[in-house]
Regions:
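Residue-level detector of beta-strand structural context in well-folded domains
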Residues: 1, 35, 55-57
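Absolute protein N-terminus
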Residues: 1-2, 72
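A basic, amphipathic helix-loop patch mediating RNA/tRNA/ribosome contacts
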Residues: 7-53
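C-terminal structural segments of small proteins and small subunits
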Residues: 46-72
Length: 72
C-alpha cells in the first residue's frame, strides 16, 4: 500500500496506526518490539524511527499479516 504524508517524516509506530495495519498504538509498539517490522529490508525495533518519503516498511507475521507500506 502507498501512504502519502505531508510532513518531512512520520515515526514508525505512527505510520503503522495511520496505515491501519495496527489498530492501536500499543499493538504497533508490540509489532515493532517483537521484530515483525522491517524498515528498508532490515528488522527495526525502534518505534520512534523516522520514516521518510521513499522508505519502505513491511509488517510480516507468518499466517496473519504480510503488508508492505511505501511512504510517498
Amino acid at each position: 500500500m502507498n501512504i502519502s504524508i505531508t510532513t518531512e517524516f512520520i515515526k514508525l509506530d505512527q505510520l503503522l496506526k495511520y496505515s491501519g495495519v495496527a489498530e492501536s498504538g500499543s499493538f504497533a509498539k508490540e509489532l515493532i518490539w517483537e521484530g515483525f517490522v522491517s524498515y528498508n529490508d532490515e528488522v527495526c525495533t525502534m518505534r520512534g524511527k523516522k520514516v521518510y518519503p521513499g522508505d519502505k516498511v513491511r509488517v510480516h507475521i507468518p499466517g496473519e499479516i504480510d503488508e508492505e507500506i511505501c511512504v510517498e
